[in-house]
Amino acid sequence: MRSYPLSEADKIVACLTPDYGLIRLVAKGARKIKSRFSGSIEPFSVGEIAFYRREDAELGILRSIELKQSYFHLAKNVNMVAALAYFGELLADFSPPHEPNENLYRMARACFKAVAGVSDDQNKMGAGVLYFELWILRLTGYLPASNVCGECRSPIRPDESVVWSSENRFLCELCAPVGRGIILKPQQAVLLSLARKLAPEAFIAQSVYKREFLKPHSAITRKLIKQVLLRDLEYWSEKNWEAVEL
């Protein structure tokens, strides 16, 4: 997901794996010009790794990596780099070290691939970012169900508005405080249902026709993420949404 200097010659590489969760490995000699890791440990690369780590150690040793897929060619697209770096930041924050989560790994790979395929389309990129936010919150247990009222527990009908309250719950119209919270009208709330049912590519394709609805949902995910992490996000932020045509 990312790498950073450890010493004059070495780097620390953060990797998300299906079997070991988030791991941090020392790539010895990676900062040297003729490093055997040259070009293979760039951010967002996909590959098969061999490593060694003692059970009680925070860092392991990267033995080798066989590169399967690289997104390095996207580095010239500033907004794309911001989106993918944002994915990496969220994964680093929401993935406990050494705790496997295959669903999270598969979701992350699917989203990286989907967003990398939208080129310079800002609307599609924004939809992909929203999908990733919704799913990382859902898979880590922070996103409540949007089809059931968090107060009265009644099902929320497809023709009914949904309100996101300050208590981080989705409420039906009857339980929601008047004039408070983020209101999602029925045609807006449908995006939450689509995100649950569709793969990222299909969600992006559907959302491009509902792009005016992306910002309210993003406001919800950003508020929730900020409350969970207790800090503002570094990469993809409101400035990136300003580029999305609404």
Where are these regions (language model features)?
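Non-catalytic alpha-helical scaffolds and adjoining flexible linkers that form interface surfaces
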Residues: M1-I12, L16-L246
